[in-house]
Amino acid sequence: MNVEEMKKIAAKEALKFIEDDMVIGLGTGSTTAYFIKLLGEKLKRGEISDIVGVPTSYQAKLLAIEHDIPIASLDQVDAIDVAVDGADEVDPNLNLIKGRGAALTMEKIIEYRAGTFIVLVDERKLVDYLCQKMPVPIEVIPQAWKAIIEELSIFNAKAELRMGVNKDGPVITDNGNFIIDAKFPRIDDPLDMEIELNTIPGVIENGIFADIADIVIVGTREGVKKLER
C-alpha cells in the first residue's frame, strides 16, 4: 500500500463519525482533501443529509464547493460537532504539529471549538517527539518576521521565512501574514512551548496543537489504526 492509499483509507474511516445534521470543520491538506471528496460523494448518494461544512482555508472552501457540500463561516454556526484535519507530526500523546498548508490559525480556531477533533495521517507522521522531522510553522505579522526569527534563537531554533514555490517572495497566508518555519532540537513539553511561542510580539499563532486531538486515524500498510486520547 502506497502513501496515497494510506491517506485514502484514513479519510474513509473518518466518514464513520459523520452523522446527519452535523456541522463539520473541514481541514486543509492532501489527506483532508480525500475526506472532503468522499464526504461529498456520500452526500450525493443520499447516505447523509443536512450537513454543513466550516472550511479552515480557501483550499477547503473550494473543495467543498466542488463537491457540493453546503458551507458556512465560523460566525454563522452555533457550534462545530466534529472537525477533521491532517497533521505534519503526531507524538505518542497525540500532540500535533500542523501548518504546512499555511492555514494553522483558522485550523486551530475551528478545531479548538469542535466537539470532537479527528486527525487523519499516514504512518510516516507518527514520531517519538514533536519536531523530530518537521519544523513548527509560525504565522507572523509581515513587518515582524525578522525580529521574531532573532527571538527564536533563544530556543536554539533554526528558523527561516517560508518562500513561495510558484510565486516570487514569501508565502502569504489567507490572513495576509507570513509563515516562519522553526526547527527546534526537540519539544518535550508541547503545551508549554505552544503557549510560550504565542507570547512573542508579532506572532499570530503557531503550529503546535497540544492536548486538542481526540482521535487520530492512521493509515498504515496493514490497514487503519485508531488512536484515542
Curated annotation (Swiss-Prot):
<feature type="binding site">
    <location>
        <begin position="85"/>
        <end position="88"/>
    </location>
    <ligand>
        <name>substrate</name>
    </ligand>
</feature>
<feature type="active site" description="Proton acceptor">
    <location>
        <position position="107"/>
    </location>
</feature>
<comment type="function">
    <text>Involved in the first step of the non-oxidative branch of the pentose phosphate pathway. It catalyzes the reversible conversion of ribose-5-phosphate to ribulose 5-phosphate.</text>
</comment>
<dbReference type="InterPro" id="IPR020672">
    <property type="entry name" value="Ribose5P_isomerase_typA_subgr"/>
</dbReference>
<dbReference type="InterPro" id="IPR037171">
    <property type="entry name" value="NagB/RpiA_transferase-like"/>
</dbReference>
<protein>
    <recommendedName>
        <fullName>Ribose-5-phosphate isomerase A</fullName>
        <ecNumber>5.3.1.6</ecNumber>
    </recommendedName>
</protein>
<dbReference type="GO" id="GO:0006014">
    <property type="term" value="P:D-ribose metabolic process"/>
</dbReference>
<dbReference type="GO" id="GO:0005829">
    <property type="term" value="C:cytosol"/>
</dbReference>
<feature type="site" description="Plays a direct or indirect catalytic role">
    <location>
        <position position="85"/>
    </location>
</feature>
<feature type="binding site">
    <location>
        <begin position="98"/>
        <end position="101"/>
    </location>
    <ligand>
        <name>substrate</name>
    </ligand>
</feature>
<feature type="binding site">
    <location>
        <position position="125"/>
    </location>
    <ligand>
        <name>substrate</name>
    </ligand>
</feature>
<dbReference type="GO" id="GO:0004751">
    <property type="term" value="F:ribose-5-phosphate isomerase activity"/>
</dbReference>
<dbReference type="InterPro" id="IPR004788">
    <property type="entry name" value="Ribose5P_isomerase_type_A"/>
</dbReference>
<feature type="binding site">
    <location>
        <begin position="28"/>
        <end position="31"/>
    </location>
    <ligand>
        <name>substrate</name>
    </ligand>
</feature>
<dbReference type="GO" id="GO:0009052">
    <property type="term" value="P:pentose-phosphate shunt, non-oxidative branch"/>
</dbReference>
<comment type="subunit">
    <text>Homotetramer.</text>
</comment>
<keyword id="KW-0413">Isomerase</keyword>
<comment type="similarity">
    <text>Belongs to the ribose 5-phosphate isomerase family.</text>
</comment>
<comment type="pathway">
    <text>Carbohydrate degradation; pentose phosphate pathway; D-ribose 5-phosphate from D-ribulose 5-phosphate (non-oxidative stage): step 1/1.</text>
</comment>
<dbReference type="Pfam" id="PF06026">
    <property type="entry name" value="Rib_5-P_isom_A"/>
</dbReference>
